[in-house]
């Protein structure tokens, strides 16, 4: 127990050192005063004499060193295991500021000793379930580099990047620095990219949507892209991000589809409409409601883009399509029709005006008048930190999300394909030895990667800040888009380049940083598993689908997970954890009704066609 610390201090809490091993257990709760390391010497003299600790009569140090020992006799050629556990409970977590918001786990356990009492008896079960997950995943047919990228980045969900409030809401930094969190508020335009949380922990993903729509959103529909804490403060401020806000609408659709939870959708539908309608505010992102974002659009590049561009444009198209589908489900016919009209207008306009024959570009407008600026004119008329004619690595991020959500193409299919080819052509660099980067270096020397932006048609004098960098979350987004376009070889080249950089020798293989270690966007790597397997699941329609390519595919929908084994004319769907509602299984272009309407852990069904 922390006796010398105020009970409201973040350092106040409990730690327990315990063992589950059998044998002669001994301990001491204090040590000799630690002058010139005498405490360690005193411990060693005690322990080395006979392997048994002797309790001291009273603590003699303000910082006493406790010790725990287990004594066993090991026979020749035999093996013995000694198991020790360190448990803790520190309830006074700070949020993004000095305010104490608390920890969810502290509501589940009174102190560190109760953690030990309740968790240690479950360790065998937890280890078995964890190993089942890992072994099943590793036994799938995905390329080794994809399995590594997807699995290793799950470490972010067990890092200090994320935490849960006492209410159960999952919150996240963008990443973490060595001693503090980086970029607070479950930043929407960063967390938009990751796919691990919704497809592995659907309930937690729903809590993030609850924060975004019901705490961080103001009455006029402005969603703060960084939610302050405590949650009662989340809507303070006026910081909206066009990509973050539109992406949250798509995520709401995704969570509804994966869960099939109509109550969840009904509860949030009013807020979804409000959040989308904010884009139609006079002089806002799409103030004239023509399906095109001409206004000032703050985004994940930490700047404002002025004028129509593919990054925000396709997020907007995806939000319109997602809102249309949710509106039909809520029997909101007029809103559904409006979303469809704006989608068709906006999609057609971007294909006609932003697609330059190779990729989609940014048409810059005057920040004051919203009038288009002559891009061939003087640079001094062009606002700083824009994209312009650059080829952006994640210009199709909205399409990335749309594919995963099953919302179809947001633009001309041929244009989308050509754009992915151009991103590989212009942004992939096989050797960075001669590359100049005025910002942070996440790649160097002879390493390879996808540039944030390339400029085959001429660079702006002052482009957006990160244009010369390479960041893995964006690379995964592009690679997944390539997979959906049938460019699997190119996609694997990009993913392999990432993992070659994070190989455990040059960099930490379990932490792919941007602004901080264990960066949330790197969990976009999980989407490569979804794309390669052709996986899509709708709990609303009770249908799951996979590619027709023979193989063994790990799948997860956020509430259950298992394997699907596909061969010529036959597929076996197996649930290893959770419960799956299923009525139809689609393999390639073939859809077959299942005999069972529900599969629980340990059950499977084989279909033939």
Please provide the spans of the model-predicted regions.
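Substrate-binding groove/exosite segments of carbohydrate-active enzymes
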Residues: 48-51, 57-71, 78, 82-83, ...
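Alpha-helical scaffold segments in carbohydrate-active enzymes
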Residues: 271-282, 322-325, 342-353, 422-429, ...
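Hydrophobic, small-residue-rich alpha-helical packing segments that form membrane-like cores
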Residues: 295-329, 338-349
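Short, surface-exposed recognition loops and adjoining beta-strand edges that mediate ligand/DNA contacts
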Residues: 349-392
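Non-catalytic C-terminal accessory modules of carbohydrate-active enzymes
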Residues: 442-448, 464, 468, 475-603, ...
């Amino acid at each position: 127990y922390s006796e010398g610390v105020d009970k409201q201090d973040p350092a106040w809490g409990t730690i327990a050192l315990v063992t589950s091993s059998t044998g002669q257990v001994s301990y001491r709760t204090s040590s000799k005063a630690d002058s010139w390391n005498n405490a360690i010497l005193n411990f060693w003299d005690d322990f080395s004499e006979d392997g048994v600790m002797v309790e001291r009569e009273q603590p003699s140090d303000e910082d006493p060193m406790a010790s725990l020992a287990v004594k066993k006799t090991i026979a020749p050629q035999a093996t013995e295991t000694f198991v020790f556990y360190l448990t803790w409970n520190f309830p006074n977590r700070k949020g993004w500021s000095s305010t104490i918001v608390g920890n969810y786990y502290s509501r589940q356990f009174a102190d560190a000793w109760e953690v030990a009492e309740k968790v240690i008896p479950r360790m065998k079960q937890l280890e078995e379930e964890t190993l089942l997950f890992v072994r099943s995943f590793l036994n799938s047919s995905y390329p080794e580099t994809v399995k590594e990228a997807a699995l290793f980045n799950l470490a972010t969900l067990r890092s200090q990047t994320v935490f849960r409030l006492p209410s159960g809401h999952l919150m996240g930094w963008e990443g973490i620095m060595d001693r503090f969190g980086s970029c607070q508020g479950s930043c929407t335009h960063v967390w938009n990219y990751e796919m691990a949380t919704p497809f592995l922990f659907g309930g937690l993903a729903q809590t993030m949507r609850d924060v975004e729509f019901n705490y961080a959103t103001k009455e006029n529909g402005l969603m703060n892209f960084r939610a302050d804490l405590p949650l009662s403060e989340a809507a303070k401020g006026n910081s909206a991000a066009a990509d973050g806000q539109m992406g949250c609408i798509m995520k709401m659709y995704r969570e509804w589809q994966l869960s099939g939870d109509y109550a969840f959708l009904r509860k949030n539908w009013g807020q979804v409409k409000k959040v989308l309608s904010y884009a139609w505010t006079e002089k806002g992102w799409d103030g004239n409601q023509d399906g095109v974002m001409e206004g000032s659009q703050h985004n994940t590049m930490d700047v404002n883009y002025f004028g129509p561009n593919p990054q925000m444009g396709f997020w907007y198209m995806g939000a319109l399509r997602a809102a249309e589908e949710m509106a039909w489900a809520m029997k909101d016919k007029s809103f559904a029709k409006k979303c469809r009209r704006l989608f068709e207008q906006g999609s057609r306009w971007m294909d006609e005006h932003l697609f330059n024959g190779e990729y989609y570009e940014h048409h810059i407008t005057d920040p004051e008048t919203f009038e288009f600026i002559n891009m061939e004119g003087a640079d001094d008329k062009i606002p700083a930190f824009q994209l312009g004619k650059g080829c952006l690595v994640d210009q199709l991020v909205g399409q990335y999300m749309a594919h995963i959500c099953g919302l179809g193409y947001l633009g001309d299919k041929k244009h989308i394909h050509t754009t992915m080819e151009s991103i590989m052509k212009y942004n992939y660099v096989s050797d960075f030895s001669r590359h100049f980067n005025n910002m942070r270096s996440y790649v160097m020397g002879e390493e390879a990667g996808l540039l944030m932006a390339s400029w085959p048609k001429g660079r702006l004098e002052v482009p957006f800040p990160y244009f010369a960098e390479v960041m893995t979350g964006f690379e995964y987004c592009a690679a997944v888009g390539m997979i959906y376009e049938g460019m699997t070889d190119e996609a694997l080249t990009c993913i392999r380049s990432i993992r070659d950089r994070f190989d455990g020798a040059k960099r930490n293989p379990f932490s792919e940083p941007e602004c901080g270690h264990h960066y949330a966007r790197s969990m976009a790597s999980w989407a490569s598993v979804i794309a390669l397997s052709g996986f899509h699941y709708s709990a609303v329609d009770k249908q799951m689908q996979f590619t027709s390519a023979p193989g063994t595919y790990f799948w997860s929908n956020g509430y259950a997970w298992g394997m699907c084994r596909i061969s010529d004319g036959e597929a076996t769907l197996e649930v290893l954890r959770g419960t799956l509602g299923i009525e139809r299984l689609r393999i390639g272009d073939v859809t077959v009704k299942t005999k069972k309407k529900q599969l629980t852990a340990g059950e499977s069904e084989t279909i033939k066609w």
